[in-house]
């Protein structure tokens, strides 16, 4: 089958790779000059297979008024009459209940566990694929006793779904990650997950791209973003780029937030809105792990919604969720918040990186659905497939989403239930 995949971020390029491995004739279309240059470029770097609790949780609405009044709030909302934002917001509010949050957790865990299995299979089959992968575990630290109690309850629920997680006291947390010693008075405890990973998402995109380049059944079209989907009747015929139309038997839309603009004229609404996130990448000193002030274990500050991941000789600091429209312009105030929070939690790491010199501030537009569950599967247009809406979990869920979509396109029974990720759900 001739299949065109739109988008070469981690979701799109994983999809193209999975389809090419099955022998399809694959054309990968991307507006940027290279792979992984959008939201996949400098994300948080955490492969959080067990920590998938949705933003739309039962207690989140009570925090929103306070968040909106804080300069350093983990969530920022720009007042707007944008009907897309209003519709997204109403759906988000409707999802902020225990029943829906538990269901979302189950659905995301099923996809993330499958994604981990496929990532491990990829690494086993490609030992020379270098993307700074490391399994060091993850600590989610809490500053508030009530929030920590809620997290412990979530651990109990996720244990019934196959997750291995442990609640640690503040002292146990610091024993697990000594770089947190300076925050002893600020944290009350943490949830530790031993089998979580870190890696460089952009490096993996480049590695998969290089493998695609070597395959005879793959064509690559970069600097050639899809301007529209070519549909006749209710059947897809291909995509139209600025340079040429590309015919196809099937088209997969995996273009992040840009997917909304492609699908809108067809009146297909996967419920996407960009959650803008930020990162800095701090070069670490020559002392090595344990002496450069940076954590070895991945750390998430639950209250601040900021993650810290050691990726090679870099400390990636990323986070926040801004609902501020469709521009990826850097907000220097949000970047400064990342510096300030790093200085408060890991001051030695910031000093070791020469006070943040060459930290490459970055912003990315994470394509989020209101519930946090991506849309993976067919559309109402015959031959048009969707792989969109992974939010902050794109890196975590990419391999599983690609495998699920490959199963569905091949008309075979998928490895996991497909219904939770369908457009009509």
Curated annotation (Swiss-Prot):
GO process annotations (BP): D-alanine catabolic process
Binding site for FAD: 3-17
Enzyme Commission code: 1.4.99.-
Catalytic activity: a D-alpha-amino acid + A + H2O = a 2-oxocarboxylate + AH2 + NH4(+)
Record's keyword terms, sorted: FAD, Flavoprotein, Oxidoreductase
GO molecular function: D-amino-acid dehydrogenase activity
A Pfam family assignment: DAO
Cofactor(s) listed: FAD
InterPro entries: DadA, FAD-dep_OxRdtase, FAD/NAD-bd_sf
Gene Ontology cellular component list: cytoplasm; plasma membrane
Keyword Oxidoreductase listed: yes
Purpose: Oxidative deamination of D-amino acids.
Xref: PANTHER family: D-AMINO ACID DEHYDROGENASE, SARCOSINE DEHYDROGENASE-RELATED
Family statement drawn from the similarity comment of this UniProt entry: Belongs to the DadA oxidoreductase family.
The name this protein goes by in its record: D-amino acid dehydrogenase 2
Organism of this sequence: Ralstonia nicotianae (strain ATCC BAA-1114 / GMI1000) (Ralstonia solanacearum)
């Amino acid at each position: 089958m001739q299949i065109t995949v739109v988008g070469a971020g981690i979701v799109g390029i994983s999809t193209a790779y999975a389809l090419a491995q099955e022998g399809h004739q694959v054309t990968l279309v991307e507006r940027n000059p290279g792979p992984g240059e959008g939201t996949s470029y400098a994300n948080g770097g955490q492969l959080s297979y067990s920590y998938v609790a949705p933003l739309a949780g039962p207690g989140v609405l009570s925090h929103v008024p306070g968040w909106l009044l804080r300069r350093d709030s983990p969530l920022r909302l720009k007042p707007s009459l944008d009907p897309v934002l209003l519709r997204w917001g109403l759906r988000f509010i409707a999802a902020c209940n225990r029943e829906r949050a538990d269901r979302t957790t189950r659905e995301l865990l099923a996809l993330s566990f499958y994604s981990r299995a496929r990532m491990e299979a990829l690494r086993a089959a490609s030992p020379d694929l270098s993307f700074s992968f490391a399994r060091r575990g993850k600590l989610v630290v809490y500053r508030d006793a009530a929030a920590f109690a809620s997290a412990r309850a979530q651990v109990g629920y996720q244990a019934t779904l196959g997750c291995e997680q442990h609640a640690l006291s503040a002292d146990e947390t610091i024993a697990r990650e000594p770089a947190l010693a300076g925050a002893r008075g600020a944290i009350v405890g943490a949830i530790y997950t031993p089998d979580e990973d870190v890696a460089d998402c952009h490096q993996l995109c480049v590695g998969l791209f290089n493998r695609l380049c070597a395959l005879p059944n793959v064509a690559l079209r970069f600097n050639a973003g899809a301007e529209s989907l070519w549909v006749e009747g209710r059947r897809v015929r291909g995509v139209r780029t600025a340079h040429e139309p590309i015919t196809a038997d099937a088209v997969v839309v995996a273009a992040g937030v840009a997917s909304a603009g492609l699908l809108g004229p067809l009146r297909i609404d996967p419920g996407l809105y960009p959650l803008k996130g930020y990162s800095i990448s701090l070069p670490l000193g020559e002392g090595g792990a344990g002496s450069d002030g940076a954590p070895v274990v991945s750390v998430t500050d639950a209250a601040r919604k900021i993650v810290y991941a050691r990726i090679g000789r870099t400390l990636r600091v990323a986070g926040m969720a801004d609902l501020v429209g469709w521009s990826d312009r850097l907000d220097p105030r949000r970047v400064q918040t990342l510096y300030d929070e790093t200085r408060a939690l890991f001051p030695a790491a910031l000093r070791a990186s020469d006070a943040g010199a060459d930290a490459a501030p970055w912003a990315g537009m994470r394509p989020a659905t209101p519930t946090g569950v991506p849309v993976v599967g067919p559309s109402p247009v015959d031959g048009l497939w969707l792989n969109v809406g992974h939010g902050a979990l794109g890196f975590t869920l990419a391999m599983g989403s690609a495998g699920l979509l490959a199963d569905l396109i091949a008309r075979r029974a998928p490895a996991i239930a497909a219904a939770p990720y369908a457009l009509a759900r």
